[in-house]
């Protein structure tokens, strides 16, 4: 059951991480800055 629990956590974290990256890139784009990491 631990594997299923960890799998659920990962599936929940992936969309949050992608959303965070998208928002960060969008804010940088709006400020006119290049996407240099």
UniProtKB/Swiss-Prot annotation:
Offer an example of a GO molecular function term for this protein: electron transporter, transferring electrons within cytochrome b6/f complex of photosystem II activity
The cross-references to Pfam families, in alphabetical order and at most eight, read: PetG
What species is this protein from?
Cuscuta reflexa (Southern Asian dodder)
Sorted alphabetically, the keyword list is: Electron transport, Membrane, Photosynthesis, Plastid, Thylakoid, Transmembrane, Transmembrane helix, Transport
Q: Report the subcellular localization.
A: Plastid thylakoid membrane
Q: Which GO terms describe its cellular component?
A: cytochrome b6f complex; plastid thylakoid membrane
What kind of membrane protein is this, topologically? Single-pass membrane protein
Which sequence ranges are marked TM in the entry?
5-25
The record, for InterPro entries, names: Cyt_6/f_cplx_su5, Cyt_6/f_cplx_su5_sf
In which domain of life is the source organism classified? Answer: Eukaryota
The entry's function note states:
Component of the cytochrome b6-f complex, which mediates electron transfer between photosystem II (PSII) and photosystem I (PSI), cyclic electron flow around PSI, and state transitions. PetG is required for either the stability or assembly of the cytochrome b6-f complex.
A single GO BP: cytochrome complex assembly
What protein is this chain from? Answer: Cytochrome b6-f complex subunit 5
**Subunit relationships:** The 4 large subunits of the cytochrome b6-f complex are cytochrome b6, subunit IV (17 kDa polypeptide, PetD), cytochrome f and the Rieske protein, while the 4 small subunits are PetG, PetL, PetM and PetN. The complex functions as a dimer.
Give the family this protein belongs to, as stated in its UniProt record: Belongs to the PetG family.
